[in-house]
Regions:
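Short alpha-helical donor nucleotide-sugar binding micro-motif in glycosyltransferases
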Residues: 91, 158, 280-281, 288-293
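A short helix/loop element that forms part of the nucleotide-sugar donor recognition site in Leloir-type
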Residues: 49-50, 198-213
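Carbohydrate-associated surface elements
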Residues: 170, 191
């Protein structure tokens, strides 16, 4: 069976989106299926129309050049047109049995055009509602024109594809509330391959010395620094934690839109000796940094996005036998059963975060 995956972006870029995609492709290939892959013009850094990475071949879509295509709203349709044009080029060559389009809805809409044109069944995988992420990133306003159009477009896609998959019950409930039959929606949860992680391994002492973490109790966060992750809240909780545990240290690994804000906040609070900020690190080194941490903290703020969507990072920490503390937003509550596989604290409350850390220690 030949499956053509229609993606926003892909490896070699590093993101939760690309890692989940890669895992899906690997598992489908283990089933003996042939997978093919195309990315939209939103993929960054393409150097050729066809690229190979990690044993996978990716067809890249052209980036729209016209100044007209840079206008708000119009630029989104330019992405769809570019993707449809590239699909028209490769469909006759690949002759896929199934189209598997992945969020966002722009991919789903382009795939829907092609599915009807070539009479190919279409599965749409919804990983999050991108209009909600856009609100957090500051590129859309909740209830604004772009927000409304994005939601309407994805609802249209939901209604017309052959089948829908999504990553959690929160998303399935929301999709069903739009009049989509529940039997059309399958939840395929976020997961990690435990064979790719080590369990309960001691921290590398050379790295501990380098980071200044020897004989310290280490809180940690490894991931992208988006506003909804709530990292400033974690910083606000540190002084109270330090009154009981002056040996505490916070290891922050990653980067993102809030990186400079977080660095400045660390400086303003005088926490340079407490917070170890590594920036982004090579993917193959991440395991060594996981092993440095005693408690992973995921202080996501309460909002529509975090209440609906389950994250991947807490599962990675669990797979390595690490303690997990997370805010009680809906996405976390779907993953974490208190005192069974983690701990929860009241979202948006730095005092409760600090109290829970102290109680755990």
């Amino acid at each position: 069976m030949k499956i053509l995956h229609i993606l926003d972006h892909s490896i070699p870029l590093h993101s939760g989106y690309t890692f989940r995609t890669k895992a899906i492709l690997e598992q489908q290939r283990k089933l003996g299926w042939e997978t093919y892959h195309i990315t939209s013009s939103k993929h960054i850094g393409a150097t050729a129309p066809i690229e190979k990475t990690d044993g996978f071949t990716f067809y890249r879509s052209k980036i729209p050049k016209s100044l007209f295509n840079r206008l708000p709203i119009v630029n989104q349709w330019a992405i769809v047109r570019s993707l449809v044009n590239r699909l028209d080029e490769i469909i006759p060559l690949i002759k896929p049995d199934i189209l598997h389009a992945h969020s966002p809805a722009l991919n789903g809409y382009a795939a829907l055009i092609i599915a009807k044109r070539y009479h190919i069944p279409l599965v749409y995988e919804c990983r999050a509602f991108w209009e909600d992420a856009a609100v957090d990133h500051g590129t859309a306003a909740e209830g604004g024109l772009r927000y409304i159009l994005s939601k309407k477009l994805e609802t249209y896609v939901f209604k017309h594809v052959n089948a829908i998959t999504t990553i959690c019950e929160g998303l399935r409930s929301d999709i069903a509330s739009r009049g989509i039959p529940v039997k059309k929606i399958t939840v395929i949860p976020n997961a990690v391959d435990i064979d790719q992680f080590t369990y309960g391994i001691e921290a590398d002492q050379a790295l501990s010395r380098k980071l200044g973490l020897q004989n310290k109790t280490v809180l940690g966060f490894i991931g992208s620094f988006y506003a909804y992750e709530g990292l400033p809240l974690l910083l606000d909780a540190l002084p109270k934690i330090m009154t009981k545990h002056p040996e505490i240290r916070l290891l922050l690994v990653g980067g993102g839109p809030q990186e400079e804000f977080i660095k400045q906040k660390i400086k303003n609070m005088g926490l340079q000796h407490v917070v170890i900020f590594t920036g982004r690190i090579a993917h193959e080194l991440v395991q060594d940094y996981y092993n440095q941490v005693d408690i992973f903290v995921y202080p996501r703020l309460a909002m529509r996005l975090t209440n609906l969507v389950t994250p991947l990072k807490p599962l990675e920490a669990m797979a390595q036998g690490r303690l997990v503390l997370a805010s009680d937003v809906g996405g976390h509550k779907e993953l974490i059963k208190p005192l069974y596989n983690g701990f929860l604290f009241k979202a948006n409350d730095a005092d409760e975060l600090a109290k829970t850390v102290i109680d755990i220690l």
